[in-house]
Amino acid sequence: MAKKNEGKRFEEDFRNSVPADVFCYRIKDSSNFYQATKNMCDFILFKSPYLFLLELKSTKANQFSTNEKIIKQHQVDDLYDANMKYTFVKSGFILNYRGRELKTKTVPPETYFIPIEYMREAYYKEKSIHKDLAKKIGIEIPYRKKITRYEYDINLRNFLKK
């Protein structure tokens, strides 16, 4: 059996961390590499009265390129439009900067919810979303490491703070 890529593992850990009283739906990706789907986001969460539209990204680097290959413009724009059009829709990106071992130190993982208003502004102004920028414009999502996987503290009220 093929080893799951780290991004899929992150999505799985995220889904398993969503509280039981929150509706959670993962939008399926296309398995056809020739015709990529144009999904607005990866996850739809509902906790009355809010609907959350979330796109998840994971990297081992210190930044996410705003290159179309990494962060899709249609996702940024569609999430922004939904967020602005509907009062009880909250959209954003969840950026996971995976931990890694360097020669001199261990860099712990960091995960942030970036509200779409801030993400859109950064997407059009910056060449990348560096971890320091995510820390400044986002809301940190606490985690704890189990043996090999992660559990995230998904408190949706925190997503409404910025």
Where are these regions (language model features)?
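N-terminal prepro-regions of secreted/extracellular proteins
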Residues: 121, 126-139
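Charged phosphate-binding loop/patch that engages nucleotide di/tri-phosphates or the phosphate backbone
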Residues: 136-162
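Histidine- and/or cysteine-centered catalytic micro-motif in compact active-site loops
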Residues: 29-30, 56-59, 96
